Amino acid sequence: MGTIKNNFQLLWLILLIVVLVNGKSINKNNNNNKNEIINVTYDGRSLIINGERKLLFSGSIHYPRTSEEMWPIILKQSKDAGIDIIDTYIFWNIHQPNSPSEYYFDGNANITKFLDLCKEFDLYVNLRIGPYVCAEWTYGGFPIWLKEIPNIVYRDYNQQWMNEMSIWMEFVVKYLDNYFAPNGGPIILAQVENEYGWLEQEYGINGTEYAKWSIDFAKSLNIGIPWIMCQQNDIESAINTCNGYYCHDWISSHWEQFPNQPSFWTENWIGWFENWGQAKPKRPVQDILYSNARFIAYGGSLINYYMWFGGTNFGRTSGGPWIITSYDYDAPLDEFGQPNEPKFSLSSKFHQVLHAIESDLLNNQPPKSPTFLSQFIEVHQYGINLSFITNYGTSTTPKIIQWMNQTYTIQPWSVLIIYNNEILFDTSFIPPNTLFNNNTINNFKPINQNIIQSIFQISDFNLNSGGGGGDGDGNSVNSVSPIEQLLITKDTSDYCWYSTNVTTTSLSYNEKGNIFLTITEFYDYVHIFIDNEYQGSAFSPSLCQLQLNPINNSTTFQLQILSMTIGLENYASHMENYTRGILGSILIGSQNLTNNQWLMKSGLIGENIKIFNNDNTINWQTSPSSSSSSLIQKPLTWYKLNISLVGLPIDISSTVYALDMSSMNKGMIWVNGYSIGRYWLIEATQSICNQSAIENYSYIGEYDPSNYRIDCNKPSQSIYSVPIDWLFNNNYNNQYATIIIIEELNGNPNEIQLLSNKIIN
């Protein structure tokens, strides 16, 4: 009987036999020999590389979501796990953030270094040029200066947009010319646009024309490899691909429309992103393996995990709005570049098994329709040796079935891969004693020494004589009414001050003599001050209504509104129209202040003087005892922490570091001048958390991230990744690190902890 085996030695003996039969080794990809010219074509069955059909597993790894010294570690682990292709976007707004005349390719924006490493580790690349990327990345990857081009309409048959897109794509192709496969580089696929088919109808006939123009223009660049356009079912001259949690049922309609195109899955959403105020989404590994196996059974030949490694939204790169700094995504490699078990090891085994039977798959056409053994149980057979038996039923009772004179037990929502009557892989099987949710973040420990050497502090209002709230640095704009925030900040800061001088009238007070401020429309978050004294906060989409308390009940005061973005929209049509800041009316009582003459200023003073790079020029207030009572504990306070690094491990392959910000509230962090990102200790209030479901291997039925989450009633994020090369600032003789924090509300920096985790490979 071919019953499910728990004996892994037997499983690997069977796999070895399959390998010998096919004359292949499991790690078969010798794809990028030095200076080898790679010929890439395709037909309806698969991609063909140098004349050989390929079954390909791809992993999304975005180069700017980790530090450049982590790239080799992440890529090596990916290769060892059976990944064939690295999938990455080009992020336009990190390479040209402020103007079309600048180019930035340093640090973790060094795309050529990343591609060199891909080739070094024998990995192909799918380069998704876009230029729209989505990716939960701020503004979908668009540089904000595009908004200033008159009459531009993004992603439309619009001359201004097409001019800018052409210039950027031509530059990218020329800049990366040596990295395309015909020139000996690792890039074997390229993508133009991104998921445009989901929004195309919102652009009408112009959308259709733009989609056609996009691929025609891309092909005119003559890069010598196939172009893809994901979720684009009206274009024949690019390979249309699928994105989603399950894509097996997309294949038949795809081949009906494009019989000469292979079936590629460019985004198997292996988890999901997390918003501030939400609990952590988890996707069961059994469901991922099930979706993979079904896709291959139906004829798919390329699967990309989105994400294979998620990493971190450093700086202000997270999109949304409201997306947290971590982009862990519950990926097989966690935010810190380490295996997320059991997702990593089971995915690796799946790749090894499928690579071993590649020729049996690709040298046979998929069956036109499956064979049904019973309700919910179907078989896809390839030749005489290989079968995929699927139970897509959701009853929790296993089924006993007969196939090819053998008896098998199959679990619900699972696939058995059978070779020569033996089970090579069961997508539902979890080895005994498996630890779930076993990843780096759950194994951090505080460094057992008093590493905070000193704490300094200064209020943003005290950083120059003009004070905060819109005065002081000459970068202010006056207007009768508030101006949309992005026009002021040019997205160089989350923060924008709106200030006006108020003289109250009888209309300002309610019947109890109180003053209430109302802002009818704003995005995303506001802090309210009167004469530099904090009054309260609000965040959209709620109406801002709060009581004001002028100092000494003064009838004249300066009203200061600090507006904040928390990541710019990354998925929408007509993003050229995107606006932030104060967009509605502003009233105190029934006194309308909207046209009261406003002063607007981009950024905090500390940001504008780059306090995180010039901390030695600041007249900091020292807190000798570093006790809570000696701290300012007021909104908009900058803190400087000197942290001892003496005796700490510096081996990037064996240790990872993070900051525990549980004692703080909301703000931003810099370590040695590197922006770690936003922090916010907002609690996850989502009511559906399924820690017990995860521990009990519950995976049956279609996955929905909204009801499969953990860590309710905890902060959405309290642990913040600090790359080791940033912590030691590329100089391992450093004895300390400098941490700069802007705390918007209040907190105790004395209780910030540096955490470490020693990696056991």
From Swiss-Prot:
Function in brief: Cleaves beta-linked terminal galactosyl residues from gangliosides, glycoproteins, and glycosaminoglycans.
Protein name: Probable beta-galactosidase 2
Family label: Belongs to the glycosyl hydrolase 35 family.
E.C. designation(s): 3.2.1.23
InterPro entries, alphabetized: BetaGal_gal-bd, Galactose-bd-like_sf, Gly_Hdrlase_35_cat, Glyco_hydro_35_CS, Glycoside_Hdrlase_35, Glycoside_hydrolase_SF
PROSITE patterns linked to this entry: GLYCOSYL_HYDROL_F35 (PS01182)
Substrates-to-products reaction catalysed: Hydrolysis of terminal non-reducing beta-D-galactose residues in beta-D-galactosides
UniProt keyword annotations, A-Z: Glycoprotein, Glycosidase, Hydrolase, Signal
Pfam families in UniProt: BetaGal_gal-bd, Glyco_hydro_35
Organism of provenance: Dictyostelium discoideum (Social amoeba)
A GO molecular-function descriptor: beta-galactosidase activity
Active site annotation, chain numbering: 195, 267
Residues that carry a glycan: 39, 110, 206, 385, 405, 438, 501, 552-553, 577, 592, 642, 690, 696
Gene3D superfamilies in UniProt: Galactose-binding domain-like, Glycosidases
